[in-house]
Design a protein with these regions (language model features):
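Extracellular glycan-recognition regions
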Residues: 1-219
Length: 219
């Protein structure tokens, strides 16, 4: 198992654990462990569907039954900014549990207002959709994100918490889109911390820890 092997375990280190990987570009170009000591800061770039510059720090899945958890602090200003937990195979096949900001229409005031939202997104061969309706969450403060694989890794459950103790289950999803057979590749599935900012302003997200533990097999 790997308990809190992210930023919180490396407060005095200028580099992440060598087991972390990135997409196409070195993660040093979009991360910092010193801008906010004790946290891994990711500066948002393009979306995970992009074949160019993506802000992702990930670890390969090595067990069928695992639980992955992180804590993110992020204050997006628009829906083009997202940050959170990624469970992915490649740029076209993934799940994202992310905090963002969306516009809502106020029927009483007849105007648009923006509010922080939590979204669970699925990309199946670049066909992107929301798994569940977006959930309203506080504008400020941390949000805790968790994914647990079950049934020999054939499915995964996503959860969130606002206090790190009381977790709410969001959805159970199939993981077939994250396999070599479905994606016609050989990279294997990865779990990661992720941030994007399609406005080009490089809005950042702070991750307090990244924890991977071997989960008990469900009976």
């Amino acid at each position: 198992s790997d308990k809190k092997s992210g930023a919180s375990a490396q407060k005095t280190s200028a580099n992440l654990d060598v087991r972390y990987t990135s997409l196409r570009q070195p993660y040093v170009s979009y991360t910092s462990l010193t801008d906010r000591p004790g946290y891994l800061r990711l500066y948002g770039q393009e979306s995970l569907n992009s074949c160019y510059n993506v802000s992702l720090v990930a670890r390969r899945q090595q067990e069928r039954h695992v639980q992955v958890e992180t804590c993110v602090e992020f204050t997006p200003t628009c829906q083009e900014q997202m940050a959170g937990l990624a469970y992915m195979y490649d740029t076209g096949n993934f799940y994202l549990l992310v905090k963002t900001r969306e516009e809502e229409f106020g029927f009483q005031t007849l105007d648009l207002k923006k509010s922080a939202k939590l979204r669970l997104i699925k990309s199946d061969h670049f066909d992107v959709e929301d798994v569940i309706p977006a959930i309203s969450i506080p504008e400020e403060g941390p949000v805790y994100l968790r994914v647990t694989t079950i049934q020999e890794g054939l499915y995964a459950k996503f959860f969130y918490s606002l206090d790190g103790k009381d977790y709410q289950e969001l959805a159970e999803v199939p993981t077939n889109i994250l396999t070599d057979e479905q994606s016609e590749g050989f990279t294997g599935a990865h779990f990661g911390m992720y941030c994007h900012d399609m406005t080009g302003l490089r809005r950042y997200a702070d991750f307090g820890y990244f924890e991977i533990v071997k989960a008990r097999k469900e009976q």
